[in-house]
Amino acid sequence: MKTDIRNLDLNLLKALDALLDERSVTRAAERLALTQPAVSGMLTRLRECFDDPLFTRAQRGVVPTLRALELAQPVKAILAEVSELLQPKAFDAATAEMTIKIAATDYALRAVIVPFMAALRAQAPGIRVAVLPVNNEQLSAQFERGDIDIALITPDSAPPDLHARSLYDEEYVCLMREDHPLSAQTGLTLDSFCAQDHALVSYVGGNFKGVTDEALAAVGRSRRVTLSVCSFLVLPEILRVSDLISVVPRRLTHDLPGLKVLPPPLAIQGFNKIVVWHERTHRDAGHRWLRELLFSTAI
């Protein structure tokens, strides 16, 4: 049966979107600030419009049919376009009040968010920022639900359905305390580098090998890693009170008193940091301004 567009209205599409996201009539009703019977009635109308059950009852909530899943993205796109139509085009950063949600690692917190926040507070004091951990497996779903607006990741982690733009290329340097036995050297030798005890950062936790070890293996060498931590933020404190050295991204070494930076004695492949965002916020004036500020403040 062919759907008559005259039987559809915006509220029905909003109800369908809420049901697809929440998978529960009760939670969809709460999200829409409607009663449960009202949402059930809207679901009945939606079923008539699309000539499909759309959802079937489950032990907990409802399960979408294949037809409902096919409608998910088009419905979100329509609602986003309508929302954009209703929003004023002008954006005044000085008076704007909004919240932006950014997914970032602790590395990106220091390298990107710190300078971004300094500029944001000066130019747009009414904008709030929520920084959340990166969950690569859930990125697409988080963007679709509106849980995050921007993610700071590497290209290999970027879902294909997101907008992406390169932020910068990062390189690795060697970090140690100022009075470390190797700090007097103008350049590390491969022998002295490999003879030291090393610390590395493993986001998954517990790994004792990384890109440095891959580079060493390529030239037939190895090192001894005696400490593996899951955060870059604790590493400077550890290096200040020990003879450990560590290979870290260069942008993490700014403003670290008591520590010295030296180039590594071999080529270690760096990485590209990118910014990704969803079509939902792609054309929004406020989000465009925030993204441009992020790019302009990246060091």
Where are the predicted features?
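Central regulatory/effector-binding core of bacterial HTH transcription factors
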Residues: 95-160, 229
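Hydrophobic hinge/microswitch elements
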Residues: 135-140, 144-148, 153-154, 204-262
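Short helix-boundary/capping micro-motifs
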Residues: 17-34
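Flexible hinge/capping segments at coil-to-helix
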Residues: 94, 162-198, 287-288
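A short LG(V/I)-centered, amphipathic sequence patch enriched
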Residues: 47-66
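Beta-alpha-beta core module
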Residues: 160-166, 170, 233-282
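Alpha-helical linker/hinge and terminal dimerization helices associated
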Residues: 49-50, 71-93
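Secondary-structure junction motif
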Residues: 182-184, 190, 196-219, 283-287, ...
